[in-house]
């Protein structure tokens, strides 16, 4: 087998800020409430900048704070120039940018331009008449009719958050408009050059000129649709509407649009950070890697979802998995990006997924929760790619308690999924209260709600989420906040928070973490995830015990010579285990990183 360094492009190990920085995602409604109204806000974020800087954060990715009706948690934007009143004012964001730059930190904003809100002025104008100048900013199509004369939408596409149509009828102009997400989120028509120029000038340049340092581009691979909008393949004959992504994900002009965006906007602002969200892609490297090849001049990094789907897809239909599956996916992305010269994003959590310590670790006891949270931190911090940490991940925040009822799951995806399934089961069984335990199990394991409850700052009422007053938070605080919070962990050298801080510093001190060529060890081992990273003269061995058992791991010859260890870090106190024998005695959920 050829060694990776013989086939990886030279630019893969070229140093760059966007590769080495630690990016921390802030979900503003749930981060910190400065004014006591129960909703997190921009001033709350400003109040915690020193905490984030001390942790080792270089960049904040700020989820949407724009003016919005909040049908879909702010991703339905009605004004890209205004800040929603619940979060503060434009002056507050200007202050946030200034305070971050003063601390040598950067701000990445969420760019949501596959769709907007139906209350955005563009759409308000668009639906007034068929000859309105903004009509073609969106996808409008005429109705069809069945053989019985029933009005039908233009095609059989299904929207993402329900089993219903991706088309909504508009009475005023007697046509349908396309919405891949909620009906309140009409899709923008990127085929229209006037729309594209408005995005570049009125949104992107407007924010970059205010000091924004880059964009996380929401579902950016959906902006190009096959213009004829053909019917989707029928995957489920029992469903009236079908998954549309064959004709709207990674569409025929998506690379053309992103190249144009780079030429018109991104190339004119040096040192920007760009990352594109690329769902519904079936993990095809030939499709995904071109987005991030430097010579293509599109994006720096992407978010891929294969690792996130190892425990089940669709998201709310969980399944068990073997460690070897998790290792194979992680390793394939490490190696393929190296071979092809692309760049990874490393993450286990964001606002759309459940908590990593509950999914990939073990939160059944405090001891296991601490150990596995540290183990996952060690893994992420030693993989090649741009590292993302989600708020609360650094203190091992866990999934919502299993005794919480469906009413506490307030995300639109959770509520719609539960309501639709309940209606189907009522109709089928005739029972007023059919068994929904399997649906609740899916929500308890993987709902987006788990990432969205308030950040746990201390053990005061509501976890110190509100800096003033005792207003009820917009979402219920986790029951365990008195035991799991920043204040309790920040002074404890053995805490998860302290380990994250040490691990982030370790990553910055050892470039093999970020740039090292990757070799998986023992791929079939269902208990230990081990790999080697190599960068210039530095060689790093990572050994992760993913079980609650003590065991002996035999180091394969690819682990290399371990007789001269120059540095190490692990999630247990005490001296480094003896490695010269070729075996490592591992404690439950032990993580061990050694540098030679």
Residue spans of the language-model regions?
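Active-site and adjacent substrate-binding regions of carbohydrate-active enzymes
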Residues: 2-596
